[in-house]
């Protein structure tokens, strides 16, 4: 069995397979640029591993320990990350399209400018995450926790955010057109210049004072006691745009 220092140099796919076969902990391993397409790494220990620019397409990383790992620019399309621990991971500009991130632990993860289109993040914990300029179009974030997350210029167009928690999140200039935010909690969220056009805001916890600062409310859907006040706000929003 190779000693611990052997993990510091770049590893090849065959070497990774051998180490996994030996039950080795790959925490801190240098896997930059490696292709691990389609491998079963479920439950693997990859804490603080360097996986920058790695091709992890369709890799099974369910329940894997990836705390603090470097996944910058990595390709994780169609990967299974359900239940994985991604706390404090660096995932800037990563491609995570159609990935399964259900119930993943993603506190303080850095996903700036990442592509998460069509990804499933149901019940994922993204508290304090850095998600500015990330692309969540058509993604599923039902019951996800995005409290205190940084969502500047983030794209949530046609995403499902039903029952999501966005308490204290900074959604400045976020693009939410066509999103479903039914029963979401936006208490104390910053929505300055956010686009809520055609958004389903029924039962959403958000104040009219917050929405008065939004960029657009055209076609937004709401009901109950909020309805009249939000209709008036939508008119004010449209008036500002025309002016």
Where do the protein language model's features map onto the residues?
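Tandem repeat scaffolds
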Residues: 3-243
């Amino acid at each position: 069995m190779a000693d611990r220092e052997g993990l510091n140099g770049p590893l090849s796919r065959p070497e990774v397979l051998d180490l996994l076969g030996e039950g080795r902990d790959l925490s801190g391993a240098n896997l930059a640029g490696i292709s691990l397409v389609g491998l079963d790494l479920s439950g693997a220990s990859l804490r603080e591993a360097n996986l920058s620019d790695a091709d992890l397409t369709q890799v099974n990383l369910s329940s894997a320990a990836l705390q603090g790992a470097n996944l910058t620019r990595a390709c994780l399309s169609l990967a299974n990350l359900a239940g994985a621990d991604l706390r404090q991971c660096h995932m800037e500009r990563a491609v995570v399209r159609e990935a399964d991130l259900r119930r993943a632990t993603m506190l303080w993860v850095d996903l700036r400018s990442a592509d998460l289109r069509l990804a499933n993040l149901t019940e994922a914990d993204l508290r304090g995450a850095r998600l500015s300029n990330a692309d969540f179009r058509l993604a599923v974030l039902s019951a996800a926790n995005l409290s205190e997350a940084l969502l500047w210029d983030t794209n949530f167009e046609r995403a499902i955010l039903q029952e999501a928690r966005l308490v204290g999140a900074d959604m400045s200039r976020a693009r939410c057109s066509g999103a479903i935010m039914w029963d979401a909690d936006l208490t104390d969220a910053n929505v300055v210049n956010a686009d809520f056009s055609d958004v389903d805001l029924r039962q959403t916890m958000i104040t009219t004072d917050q929405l008065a600062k939004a960029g657009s409310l055209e076609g937004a859907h709401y009901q109950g006691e909020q309805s009249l006040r939000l209709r008036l706000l939508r008119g004010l929003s449209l008036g500002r745009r025309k002016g």
